[in-house]
């Protein structure tokens, strides 16, 4: 859930993500620390990685982000490295394979959305050259405008999913509080949201 549209609040706590991660014990196997420190909010250049993040955000709906991070490798394997062309070609046999895979979220609507969205990204690439170029071309938009655009092109394009996807990939601010050391690292990577400030 977004707090004032500026920073992710970790569910069932009153903390933002940075504060939540800071409370984790050093010996934990919780994957949030690594994700917070090395991925969350950092710009992504590769279309397949952008697609992966979108699929994970979609699958997180109604579940915890910690669960998504724990299942990330299984998702990568099951979705063939999130190769957009490969996923776009998935047929009913592939859908049945995914529905039988206990390593991922076995939700037909979410699986169908991933395949549909891969096909949409293929069409976007024909016009813009890449999914990233499409995102860059439409930047800057506010969250409401992004949601409207995503709903026009993708399945599962609601406000929370789109907001988190764009925050986690550097298109919207708010992944980290300004006092978080990772915030400066992200600024050094020149995220798109910083261009609009």
Q: What positions do the PLM features span?
A:
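HhH-family (HhH-GPD) DNA N-glycosylase catalytic core used in base-excision repair
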Residues: 10-197
């Amino acid at each position: 859930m977004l707090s004032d549209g500026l920073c992710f609040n970790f569910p069932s706590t009153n903390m933002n993500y940075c504060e939540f991660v800071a409370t984790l014990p050093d010996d934990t196997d919780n994957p949030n620390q690594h994700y917070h420190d090395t991925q969350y909010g950092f710009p992504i250049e590769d279309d397949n990685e952008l697609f992966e993040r979108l699929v994970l955000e979609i699958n997180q709906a109604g579940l915890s982000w910690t669960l998504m991070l724990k299942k990330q490798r299984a998702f990568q394997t099951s979705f063939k490295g999130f190769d957009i062309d490969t996923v776009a070609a998935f047929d009913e046999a592939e859908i049945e394979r995914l529905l039988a895979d206990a390593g991922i979220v076995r939700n037909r609507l979410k699986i169908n959305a991933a395949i549909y969205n891969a096909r949409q990204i293929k069409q976007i690439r024909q016009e813009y050259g890449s999914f990233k170029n499409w995102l860059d071309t439409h930047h800057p938009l506010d969250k409401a405008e992004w949601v409207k655009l995503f709903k026009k092109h993708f399945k599962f394009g609601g406000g929370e999913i789109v907001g988190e996807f764009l925050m986690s990939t550097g298109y919207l601010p708010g992944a980290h509080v300004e006092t978080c050391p990772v915030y400066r690292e992200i600024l050094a990577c020149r995220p798109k949201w910083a261009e609009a400030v």
